[in-house]
Structures are given as structure tokens and as C-alpha cells.
Amino acid sequence: MTARDPTRVPATLEDLLAIPEEQRRHELIEGAIEEKGSATSEHGDAQHSLSAFTFAFKHEPGGRWPGGWWFGTEVEVHFDPANTFRPDVTGWRRDRVAERPRGTPVRIRPDWVCEILSTNRRNDLVRKKRVYHRFGVPHYWIIDPAEETLSVLRWSQDGYVEILAAERGETVRAEPFEAMPLQVGIFFGDDEKDEAPAQEG
């Protein structure tokens, strides 16, 4: 782990937003501006497939699909003066957030965040994870394209608890979206199969 320079002046949200929007693939993490890892085709495919899966949840509840959520992809979310992130996919429950979050950065704490690991995986697994926990994000998913795995984490007082670990080839029900079976392989290039049985996670 790289040592932090105690004399460094912390960056601010204003410093982050000063980067031109079309060039801003950056995050403010613990007072430092860091560029997100380069998006590989595997990362992009996983992100696209996750957005397709969550489509069933993005409407008002009570219709054909479960609904009940707002979602955003690469939305800037502000937590505190030292931390503004761009999670790969972010969700807010409609029963808590009446209107779709707008503007940038969004200042409403998410109910669910998913990060897809890339070259800066330490940020997702350690530093950003600590912030998500500190601000009470209830659900945290981690998709690892290299290992072809999905980790589903649930908030607890002492830290996130992994309640489900799944790999390519498995079909699971993963909270908070357990109303729909999830074929994990769709994140890693597999076509969705109608006949796949679901196992409880």
C-alpha cells in the first residue's frame, strides 16, 4: 500500500468538478483525486448486463416487474468533503427517495452500489468500501471479471458481511433483487438461459 504524504493538501469537491466533464473519469477518495481504471471490454459487458438485469426493478412497484428502484450508471455520488465517487451502478429505493436523484454530484446516500473490479481494485475492495460502510449503504455488490465471480455484501454494524458468493454458471437470488433469478454468467459474456434453475442465496 502506498504511503500517504501527511503534508499533502487534501483535494476538494471543487477540485474534482474543475476537471472538464468530458474528461472526468475521476473520483475524490479520502481527499485525493484518482482516475478510475481503464474500462476493458469485459468491464463494459458486465456493466451493460447488470443494467439490463436491474431494468425489471426500475419502475414503480405493482406492475409486471418488481420495480421499486431508481438507478444510475457512473453517477457522481457525494458522501463528505473528502469522498465523491462514481460507482459503476448505483440504486436508490423509491420508498425512501420519492423522486429520481438529479444533478451532479448526487447527495443522497444510495441503498445499493455495485463496483466492477478493474486495475484499481484496491479502491473498491478497501478504501471505497470503508466509506460505503461508514455512510450506511445497505447493499454492496462486487463483480470480478477476472475471477468471474459475484460477491453480495450486506451492511452490519461491524462491517460488511458477505451473504452470497457466486460464480459463472450459477443462478442465484441476490438481495436486494432476490425477486428475480440472476444468472451470474451474464456478467461474463454468457447468454441468458430460460431453463436455468434458481437456488436460494
Describe the residue ranges of each PLM region.
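Gly/Pro/Ser/Thr-rich low-complexity, intrinsically disordered segments predominantly at protein N-termini
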Residues: 1-201
